Design a protein with these regions (language model features):
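Rhodanese-like catalytic fold shared by cysteine-dependent sulfurtransferases
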Residues: 1-21, 25-145, 149-270, 276-417
C-alpha cells in the first residue's frame, strides 16, 4: 500500500475516467459522526469480508482514510495484497490533513442515498401531504390507498393507521391491477427518502392517479402528536402476479429511460450481481448473485457498492422490480444494467449484510421527538451542504428520461477542490 498526498488523492477523485473506491476503515459508530464526502464505511473489524463485496474489481483505485496507526496500516496492506487489489493508497496525514485543507466532510447514516432522495424531491416537485391533513382524511370515507413503502419487517414493527405495505421496488407490480389502479395514492416511510422514491416511481411507471407523500413519514406523524400502529401484519403475499403484464410494463419503462439491458451468461467476477428479493412471492435463489431488497439497495447503497464505475447487473423474477432498481442506481450515477434473462448460477460467495445499529439520532424511531426533529432537519440540510461545496447539480433531474450516460457524484463534487 502506497501513501498518497491529499492533493493527489483529490486528482484521483475528480477524474471521471478513474474507477475509484474511497473507504473509511473506522468502526461504524465513529464513522457516522463525521466522514469525508464519498467515503464508504468498511470497518476494520470485518474488513476482509466487507471489501470483497464492496469492491469486486481488483483493478479499482482504492483510497483509504481513517487509519489511525502503523498496525492498522500493516493490516490493511496485508489483507488488500492477499486479495490481489492492485492500486491501493493511504491518504497521508489522514483526517488531520483532510480537515486542515478544508475538504468536504459530512455526517450521518446512508448519507449519500439520503441526500439523493432530497434531490429527487426538489427536482420532481413532489406533492406533500402533512400529518394534520392525513388525519382529516382518515376521519371520512376516501379513495386513497395509503402505502408504507418500507420492507415488510420494518412495517410489522410499526406503521400508521390505515397503511398497507409494499416495498418501493414492488410498487409497479402491486399497483398494476384493476383494484389498485382505481385508487389515488398516499405513500410514506419512517422519514423521507423511501416515500420520495416511491412517489417518483409511480410517476416513472406512468401511473397518472393523484398521488402524495406524507411529509416526514411516521416521525413527523409522531411529532404532530398522533399515534402509530404496532405489530401489524403485511398482506403483500396476497398480491396477484401477472408476469406478462409486468414484463410488458418493464419493457415499456426501460425504453422510456433508455436503460441498458443484458442477457449475458458468462460471469465476470469483477462486477456486481444482485438478485432482488421479492416479498410478494418466494423465488429460487441464484448462486453467485447477492440477495437484496430493491428498496434497500437504493436506500442503503453504501452497504453494497463502493466503486464509482464498476458494472452492476440487476436481476429480478418480477421484471418491473429490476427496472426500478436499474433506473434508481443509474440516477445515482452507478453503471447499473438490467439482466433480462434468468442468469446461470456461478461460483461467487458473499458476506451476510446485516442492518447496522442506529447511531445517528438513535432514538428517532422510539418516539423521541427531539431525535426525530433533529434527524428531519439533518435531511433538509444535505443539499444545501453539497451546494456550499460548489456542486449545483449533484445528480440528474428526476424529470430526465434518458439515463444512457451516467456520472458519479463524487467526480462532480471534487472537481471544485
Amino acid at each position: 500500500m502506497q501513501f498518497i498526498e491529499v492533493k493527489n488523492a483529490i486528482k484521483l477523485l475528480k477524474n471521471p475516467k478513474q474507477n475509484i473506491a474511497f473507504l473509511d476503515i473506522r468502526e461504524r459508530k465513529q464513522y457516522v459522526q463525521g466522514f469525508a464526502f464519498g467515503t464508504i464505511n468498511c470497518p476494520l473489524s470485518k474488513f476482509k469480508t466487507t471489501i470483497k463485496d464492496l469492491v469486486p474489481d481488483q483493478s479499482t483505485a482504492i483510497l483509504f482514510i481513517g487509519i489511525k496507526n502503523t498496525a492498522q496500516t500493516i493490516k490493511v496492506g496485508r489483507i488488500t495484497k492477499s486479495l490481489n487489489y492492485k492500486n491501493v493508497f493511504q491518504i497521508e496525514g489522514d483526517y488531520k490533513k483532510w480537515k486542515k485543507e478544508k475538504l468536504p466532510i459530512w455526517a450521518g447514516e446512508y448519507t449519500f442515498s439520503k441526500a439523493f432522495g432530497e434531490w429527487i424531491e426538489i427536482t420532481s416537485e413532489v406533492k406533500n401531504l402533512f400529518p394534520k391533513q392525513l388525519k382529516k382524511i382518515h376521519q371520512k370515507p376516501n379513495n386513497y390507498l395509503q402505502i408504507d413503502a418500507r420492507p415488510k419487517k420494518e412495517f410489522e414493527k410499526f406503521t400508521l393507521p390505515n397503511s398497507v405495505q409494499c416495498s418501493g421496488g414492488e410498487l409497479p407490480c402491486f399497483i398494476n391491477n384493476q383494484t389498485n389502479l382505481k385508487k389515488d395514492y398516499i405513500v410514506h416511510c419512517a422519514g423521507r427518502t423511501r416515500s420520495i422514491v416511491a412517489y417518483q416511481t409511480l410517476k416513472d411507471f406512468n401511473f397518472k392517479n393523484e398521488k402524495y407523500v406524507l411529509n416526514g413519514g411516521t416521525q413527523n406523524w409522531v411529532l404532530n402528536g398522533y399515534d402509530r400502529d404496532f405489530k401489524n401484519k403485511s398482506k403483500i403475499k396476497s398480491t396477484k402476479l401477472n408476469f406478462k403484464s409486468d414484463l410488458n410494463l418493464a419493457n415499456q419503462i426501460a425504453k422510456k429511460f433508455n436503460i441498458p439491458k443484458s442477457s449475458q451468461k458468462n460471469k465476470n467476477h469483477s462486477c456486481h450481481y444482485f438478485q432482488l428479493n421479492s416479498e410478494i412471492k418466494n423465488f429460487k435463489k441464484i448462486k453467485g448473485w447477492k440477495q437484496v431488497n430493491a428498496t434497500t439497495l437504493v436506500q442503503n447503497t453504501d452497504k453494497f457498492i463502493a466503486s464509482t464505475k464498476t458494472k452492476i447487473f440487476i436481476f429480478s423474477n418480477i421484471p418491473t422490480s429490476a427496472v426500478f432498481a436499474t433506473i434508481w442506481l443509474r440516477r445515482m450515477g452507478y453503471n447499473a444494467i438490467w439482466q433480462i434473462k434468468n442468469p446461470r448460477s456461478f461460483k461467487k460467495s458473499y458476506s451476510i449484510t446485516k442492518p447496522d445499529p442506529t447511531y445517528f439520532f438513535p432514538k428517532r424511531h422510539l418516539g423521541n421527538k427531539s431525535h426525530s426533529r433533529g434527524y428531519l432537519n439533518w435531511e433538509h440540510s444535505l443539499i444545501p451542504t453539497i451546494r456550499k461545496w460548489g456542486c449545483k447539480q449533484p445528480w440528474v433531474s428526476a424529470n430526465q428520461n434518458n439515463l444512457r450516460d451516467v456520472k458519479h457524484t463524487i467526480y462532480k463534487v471534487y472537481k471544485n477542490f
